[in-house]
Structures are given as C-alpha cells and as structure tokens.
UniProtKB/Swiss-Prot annotation:
GO terms for molecular function: iron ion binding; magnesium-protoporphyrin IX monomethyl ester (oxidative) cyclase activity. It comes from Prochlorococcus marinus subsp. pastoris (strain CCMP1986 / NIES-2087 / MED4). Keywords: Chlorophyll biosynthesis, Iron, Metal-binding, NADP, Oxidoreductase, Photosynthesis. Its cofactor is Fe cation. One of its GO terms (biological process) is photosynthesis. It is an enzyme of class 1 (oxidoreductase). The lineage of its organism: Bacteria, Bacillati, Cyanobacteriota, Cyanophyceae, Synechococcales. This is Magnesium-protoporphyrin IX monomethyl ester [oxidative] cyclase. InterPro entries: AcsF, Ferritin-like, Ferritin-like_SF, Rr_diiron-bd_dom. Pfam families: Rubrerythrin. Pathway: Porphyrin-containing compound metabolism; chlorophyll biosynthesis (light-independent). Catalyzes the formation of the isocyclic ring in chlorophyll biosynthesis. Mediates the cyclase reaction, which results in the formation of divinylprotochlorophyllide (Pchlide) characteristic of all chlorophylls from magnesium-protoporphyrin IX 13-monomethyl ester (MgPMME). It comes from the Bacteria.
C-alpha cells in the first residue's frame, strides 16, 4: 500500500510507499462487485433481522470510543527499534485492511441507495466504522513519523472483482476472524500487561464489537439470500457479447441450477474458510511471528485459537465448516509455513533466476498438494457441529 512520505521525529525522511504498494497474496486487497445484482436483492425473507441490525448500527455504540488520551503521548519513543518496526508493519496492514473495507462499503451504499435503501444504510454505517478504525490507526502511525496517504491509495490501488456471493462469504469470515483476533489479543494483554507495547490495544475490546456486528450483518444477509443472488447466473460475457438470446435459455437455467445447488454452497464454504485461515496462518507464523512474540503471544497457539473459534462461529451460517480438529489439519499448514522459509532462503542465494525458479518448483508443488489435501478433508456438517445454535 502506498503511503505519504512524512518527516520523522529525528528529521529523517521516511518513505515506505513502494514497499506498501507492492501486492502479494498475503497483503490486503481492494474489492469491487456487481452493484446491479446487489441493488436487486430481495431481503424479504429476513428483513426483520436486517432492520434490527441496522437499528444497532444507528445507535453507533463506539461513537465516542476512539478518542486518544494522554497515554499516547511519548508512547512511541518507549518502543525499541526492532519492536517498533514490527508494530509499524502491523499498523500498515491493519490500516490498509480497514480502509479497503471502507471503500467497498461506501461504494455499495452509494450505488444501491435508490433501489435498496435498507441495505444501503447498513453498508453506510459499516463504512463509517471502517473509516473510523482506519483513521485511528493512521493517527497511531503518525506517532511513529509515518502516515498512509489514503487518497493516493484510493486512486492507485488495483481493485479485484468478486461476485456478490464471494463478497458475502469472504467478508463474513473476515469480520468474524477480526473479532476473534482482537478480543484474543485484548484478553491476553489484560492478563499480561507487560506485553502491552502501545496504548492502541486498550481500544480492542470495544473495537472488536464493531467487527462482530459487521459479521452478524453478513450472517443475516446470507440468510436473506439462502442460495445466491439470482442475477449471478443470468448472463455470461464471451468476447464482449452478452448471451441474452432465447437459444441460450437452457444454458442459463443450467448455470443457475449449478450455482444454487446445496453442494455448491458447501464447496464455496470450504473454499473461503480454507483460503482465509491458510492466509492468516502462513502470514502470522511467517513474517508476523516476531510481532506476536513482542506481545508475549505464541503465534501458533494464538492462530489456532482464532481459527478454531472462527470456524465454530461460521457453523451458524455456513452449511459445513472445516474439520480443524483433524490431526493433519495444522500439520499441513505447518508444512506450508516451513516451505515458506525454504522459499525465502532460496531468494537470498545469489543464483541465476532460472536456478531459483527450478529450486522453488518442488516447493510450490508441495504447497499446492497440502492445500488440496486440506480442501478435500471431510468437512463437519454444521447441523451436527452446532445443532443447538442452528
């Protein structure tokens, strides 16, 4: 993510824009979706719950929560150089992620407000929360002599298109996993105050409730759309032409049936859960491990707790969840983390690029094999996993 150059406290110019702008599979992305399909969504199946959640958003419980106090004064100067770098990296990623959510929710609220006002209002309230979070994180970065240029970011970041159903799945998991991440850190630091390296963590208890409410919204939204958005299967683009001729009617019916079959929902549930869990685990046990160590957390134990809790929570809305209790689940993720270390070691060697690529190929194949085995692991039926809740 790009960020503005700001003079640090020691008057040394700092510019990390190029580093942040560099995208990888593990960095937060910016998203767009099918706004026409979203505005046509029929919420009548679960409108009462969505209206109740919107009323919760209107109350804005955290309106006066994100107010900096005297604890922030000079707090950045007390952090050693190594921990400082780790924490700034955490702030950058978190701010980018929150701002990404703001842009998506804000654009949705603007595009669908005329035809789907209830949905638009919910997205507007969530955009408010995400903007507040991003701004608060950006102020903490300013304590370290840095600041993200959010305007530049909006104009220059590439946007990834996801169909509405993919947005529902991925964002629900993202919001719920955010809740468990923040509350786990907050509870740990309550018991171990020596690991509280910056006063930002004092705000995590109320902060995580925003994430939880956002997740509840997507839960209710998916209940209002038990299969998928109808317009997903009504057209397909080939060489710039839309197949709307009656001759393609049976083709569209088949695509609609395929997209809406319960088995497909189960496959998508497994895919998005695994994608989010694997990405977090690989990142946290790879490049972020030392940051959690600075907080006094064991990164592996922390991630496994968060994954288990998010998986359990997801059983409230997804038809199946991952069997994270199978002994092979975390072993395979650990193998991918180990492979990541091997890839980094290859990059450090002064060998020709061809040699590096050939050396990495077996590792990439190994990673793909582990992910396929994880995906094919027999899932847990949510009705059996949490019958009392469902």
């Amino acid at each position: 993510m790009a960020q503005q150059t700001i003079e640090s406290n020691n008057k040394k110019s700092v510019n990390r824009g190029k580093d942040i702008a560099k995208d990888t599979i593990l960095t937060p992305n910016f998203y767009t979706t099918d706004f026409e399909a979203m505005e046509k969504m029929d919420l009548s199946i679960n409108e009462d719950e969505l209206e109740a959640i919107c009323e919760e958003f209107r109350k804005d419980y955290n309106r006066h929560h994100f107010v900096r106090n005297k604890e922030f004064e000079g707090a950045a100067d007390k952090i050693d150089a190594e921990t400082r770098e780790l924490f700034v990296d955490f702030l950058e990623g978190s701010c980018t992620s929150e701002f990404s959510g703001f842009l998506l929710y804000k654009e949705l609220s603007k595009r669908i407000k005329d035809k789907n006002p209830l949905l638009a209002e919910c997205f507007a309230h969530m955009a408010r929360d995400e903007a507040r979070h991003a701004g608060f994180l950006n102020k903490s970065m300013n304590d370290f002599g840095l600041q993200l240029d959010l305007g530049f970011l909006t104009a220059n970041k590439d946007y990834t298109y996801f169909a509405p159903r993919a947005i529902f799945y991925a964002t629900y998991i993202s919001e719920k996993i955010g809740y468990w991440r923040y509350i786990a850190i907050y509870r740990h630091l309550e018991k171990n105050p020596s690991g509280k390296i910056f006063p930002l963590f004092n705000f995590f208890e109320n902060w995580c409730q925003d994430e939880n409410r956002h997740g509840d919204f997507f839960d209710a939204l998916m209940k209002a759309q038990p299969r998928t958005v109808k317009s997903l299967s009504q057209k397909i683009e080939i060489f710039g032409y839309t197949l709307k001729h009656p001759i393609f009617d049976y083709y569209h019916r088949f695509r609609y049936f395929l997209n809406n079959h319960p088995i497909v929902s189960k496959l998508w549930s497994r895919f998005f859960l695994l994608a989010v869990f694997a990405t977090m685990y690989i990142r946290d046990l790879g490049t972020k491990r030392n940051f959690y160590g600075a907080l006094g957390l064991n990164a592996r134990e922390y991630d496994q707790f968060v994954i288990n809790k998010t998986n359990e929570t997801s059983a409230k809305v997804f038809p199946v969840v991952l069997n994270v209790y199978d002994k092979s689940f975390y072993k395979r993720l650990d193998r991918i983390v180990e492979n990541g270390t091997r890839l980094s070691e290859i990059d450090k060697k002064e060998n020709p690029n061809v040699i590096k690529v050939l050396s990495k190929l077996p590792i990439f194949i190994s990673n793909g094999y582990q992910l396929i085995r994880l995906y094919l692991l027999k899932p847990l039926e949510s009705d059996d996993f949490q019958p009392s809740i469902r």
